[in-house]
């Protein structure tokens, strides 16, 4: 490669000269066309768009975190309510169980009393039936005994009337 200040470099046939001239012309055209300003503007636009996207992403993230915090708070509140509802339900079940036991005991007591009353009535009725049967039997036996005595010793009209009334009076 020939040195820049040597005469050989400045000859028209030297391709390195034309490469240098082309490079200088290219740089001049780029500067004249305001390419650096356009490139800087495009870079600034891209940077601004990226910054806007980052700001939007930060805003969305903040909203998502706030929403997540709200959802967590709602979930915790719901869990507290569920625990309270479960405790209330358990208390209600316990109260219902106590009431059901009391009602069952009361019903059993009433049925036992009713059964005892029926048994007492049946016993009283049976005793009354037995008494009535005994009275009837005693009256019949007395009537037969008196009839036999009267038949053996004669009959008196007053005694016959009294014997007829014995059965009705004993009952």
From Swiss-Prot:
Its main location: membrane. InterPro entries: ATP_synth_b/b'su_bac/chlpt (IPR002146). Keywords: ATP synthesis, Cell inner membrane, Cell membrane, CF(0), Hydrogen ion transport, Ion transport, Membrane, Transmembrane, Transmembrane helix, Transport. It is a single-pass membrane protein. The keyword Nucleus does not apply. GO terms for cellular component: plasma membrane; proton-transporting ATP synthase complex. GO terms for molecular function: proton-transporting ATP synthase activity, rotational mechanism. It holds the Pfam family ATP-synt_B. The chain crosses the membrane at residues 19-39. It is found in: Cell inner membrane. Belongs to the ATPase B chain family. F-type ATPases have 2 components, F(1) - the catalytic core - and F(0) - the membrane proton channel. F(1) has five subunits: alpha(3), beta(3), gamma(1), delta(1), epsilon(1). F(0) has three main subunits: a(1), b(2) and c(10-14). The alpha and beta chains form an alternating ring which encloses part of the gamma chain. F(1) is attached to F(0) by a central stalk formed by the gamma and epsilon chains, while a peripheral stalk is formed by the delta and b chains. F(1)F(0) ATP synthase produces ATP from ADP in the presence of a proton or sodium gradient. F-type ATPases consist of two structural domains, F(1) containing the extramembraneous catalytic core and F(0) containing the membrane proton channel, linked together by a central stalk and a peripheral stalk. During catalysis, ATP synthesis in the catalytic domain of F(1) is coupled via a rotary mechanism of the central stalk subunits to proton translocation. This is ATP synthase subunit b. The gene is atpF.
